[in-house]
From Swiss-Prot:
This is Putative ABC transporter ATP-binding protein SAR2766. It comes from Staphylococcus aureus (strain MRSA252). InterPro entries: AAA+_ATPase, ABC_Co_transporter, ABC_transporter-like_ATP-bd, ABC_transporter-like_CS, ABC_transpr_CbiO/EcfA_su, ECF_ABC_transporter_ATP-bd, P-loop_NTPase. PANTHER family: ABC TRANSPORTER ATP-BINDING PROTEIN BC_2655-RELATED (PTHR43553:SF26), HEAVY METAL TRANSPORTER (PTHR43553). It holds the Pfam family ABC_tran. NCBIfam families: PRK13648.1 (NF010167). SUPFAM superfamilies: P-loop containing nucleoside triphosphate hydrolases. One of its GO terms (molecular function) is ATPase-coupled transmembrane transporter activity. Probably part of an ABC transporter complex. Responsible for energy coupling to the transport system. It is a peripheral membrane protein. PROSITE patterns: ABC_TRANSPORTER_1, ABC_TRANSPORTER_2.
């Protein structure tokens, strides 16, 4: 019988800063060549599990270890980080924490340089993998000029060069646009098939990541593995709901259509599922009997107006934003989508005054260009994509209170507002914690809280749901909906097709610095050309409609959106 390449036996780990173990009594074997998906809510222990395998725990991050862990038949606790890196390659969730070089090419070549590889061979290797991860045109760019998704692809290329027998990817889709994420998963699957490496992917976005190419899924909750099973069996169980993880949209749609999902053999393969005549009949019957009128219209009063706005970085030949014309309406929830590097984050920074622009921005029919960043912050709050770019304080409470203190508010009033927002964002229990002890997703919630507490009229959130499990996703989005009902205008820059379809009244699509679409979410997701231009990926609902033979997929998509909203309101 094949020996496991990774073996946990009665394994527990507790950080020195925590009162209870983050991992509790883990017993699992992973065998050579397996492709395993690790799933769990934010703070469930899945990243800690991965870090125990790659050696960051205990060689960099200290804590109390009990039980046994063997990697490649070696006791994992007596090795060292350098030796472990020859066996385990890791793409971290926080891309800034992994970027070393001054350019993308230099970063990808880091390992080769340390191994004294000849320059000609080094260039060939870097070019080969840069082509694979679609970064060949960005090799000479500095890290600060790359989007979060582009940085992640650079890190992926640098790890793939090493060809380690074990490859770990921690939230690989977190900063990628949907189409690029899909291509990344396809690339990883091809690499897995070609190299027969052991691949562990840590992810909670099952809509994009889960399929029947995975041998197993490990589901974490509160530091324990509550499911160790096949993708199909996991989807048939109630374990995902128990762990606060959202199932793929098509599974939810099947249940709304009263399909008996437990009777489906391979539920993780959508194409096979839709070949069933029973499934086709049930879904079409659901569409025919249910009204799908869109009841979510945005207001017609402009609040923010952008006229021919352009932004150009000094070392880019082309404009990052090119003659952008855009109205943002009072009390709407607007989503802005597009491929990595399309200009989405640049647009937000231009509105907030972080970048010099040409063109004109008006707020409430008054000139906005001449206002300083501080003056604009009275009206507009901005939550950046990377939480590490925003955090200034060491403690959670102090970080959320920072803006209020800068405005001279009384400490007693600050306490009330900060604690209220911390409760809403699921952070109240951690209010006295150091920020360094938080996961990436928890840090993201801290930055959202630090802006929400200031109560601006417009809130811009760059990837608000990145790194969030379904429970905290719903908590944050429910709070944003409530703010919207109170009169706040919400702008969400996102790759999340769930968020786009479920919470947006309008969607603006950017591509190469230009607005290429400005319409409803359903029409965006139903337009193959727009999805291709903007590197969007149509959801599993659209794929379901095509497989079943529904001539107007937008009917199924709109029906699902309306029905799901009603269910969530109950």
């Amino acid at each position: 019988m094949t020996e496991p390449i990774i073996s946990f036996k009665d394994f527990s780990f507790q950080y020195h800063s925590q009162a209870t173990p983050t991992l509790q009594n883990i017993n699992v074997d992973i065998y050579p060549g397996e492709k395993v998906l690790v799933v769990g809510a934010s703070g469930s222990g899945k990243s800690t599990f991965a870090n125990c395998i790659n050696g960051l725990i205990p060689f960099k991050t200290k804590g109390n270890v009990t039980g046994e862990l063997h990697i490649n038949n070696q006791d994992a606790t007596v090795s060292c980080l350098h030796k472990r890196s020859n066996v385990v390659g890791t793409v971290l969730q926080d891309t800034d924490g992994q970027f070393i070089g001054l350019t993308a090419a230099e970063d990808m070549a880091f390992l080769l340089e340390n191994n004294c590889v000849e320059q000609d061979d080094m260039k060939k290797n870097v070019s080969y993998w840069a082509e694979k991860v679609d970064m060949i045109e960005h090799l000479n760019h500095r890290p600060q000029d790359l989007s979060g998704g582009q940085k992640q692809r650079v890190s992926l290329g640098g790890i793939l060069i090493h060809r380690t027998p074990i490859l770990i990817l921690d939230e690989p889709l977190a900063n990628l646009d949907p189409a690029t994420g899909h291509e990344t998963l396809r690339l990883l699957n091809n690499i897995h098939e070609e190299t027969k490496s052991t691949m562990i992917i840590v992810e909670h976005r099952l809509e994009e990541s889960l399929d029947d190419t995975f041998d197993r899924v490990l589901l974490f909750k509160d530091g324990k593995i509550i499911a160790n099973t096949t993708p199909s069996d996991l989807l048939k169980s109630s374990k995902l709901k128990e762990a606060g993880i959202r199932e793929p949209l098509y599974c939810t749609a099947l249940k709304y259509a009263e399909v008996d999902v437990e009777s489906i053999d391979n539920l993780a393969n959508l194409r096979e599922v839709c070949m069933s005549e029973h499934v086709k009949f049930k879904v079409k019957k659901w569409i025919d009997k249910t009204s799908s009128n869109d009841d979510n219209k945005y207001k017609s009063e402009p609040l923010l107006e952008l006229n021919e706005v352009c932004v150009q970085y000094s070392d880019y030949s082309n404009s990052v934003l090119n003659n952008v014309q855009l109205n943002v309406y009072r009390r709407e929830m607007l989503s802005i989508v597009g491929h990595n590097g399309a200009g989405k984050s640049t647009l937000a920074k231009a509105i907030c005054g972080f970048l010099d622009i040409t063109g004109n921005i008006q707020f409430c029919n008054k000139g906005f260009n001449q206002l300083s960043i501080s003056e604009r912050s009275e009206f507009i709050g901005y939550v950046m994509q990377n939480p590490n770019h925003m955090i200034s304080e060491k403690m959670i409470y102090d970080e959320v209170a920072l803006g209020l203190r800068a405005r001279g508010m009384k400490e007693s009033d600050i306490k009330i507002r900060v604690e209220n927002v911390l409760k809403i964002c699921g952070l109240y229990a951690f209010r006295n914690w150091p920020i360094a002890a938080l996961s990436y997703g928890q840090k993201k919630r801290v930055t959202i809280a630090s802006v929400l507490v200031l109560n601006p009229e417009i809130i811009i959130l760059d990837e608000p749901t990145a790194g969030q499990d379904f429970y905290h996703y719903n908590e944050i989005m429910s709070f944003l909906i409530e703010l919207n009902r109170q009169g706040k205008t919400i702008i969400m820059i996102t790759h999340d097709m769930h968020l786009l379809s479920e919470y947006s009244s309008r969607t603006v699509v950017l591509s190469k610095g230009q607005v290429v679409a400005d319409t409803t979410p359903v029409l965006v997701l139903n337009d193959k050309k727009i999805c291709e231009i903007a590197s969007l990926r149509q959801t599993s609902l659209f794929e379901m409609a095509e497989y079943i033979g529904i001539s107007e997929p937008q009917k199924l998509i709109q029906l699902f959106i309306n029905h799901d909203r009603k269910v969530r309101r109950q």
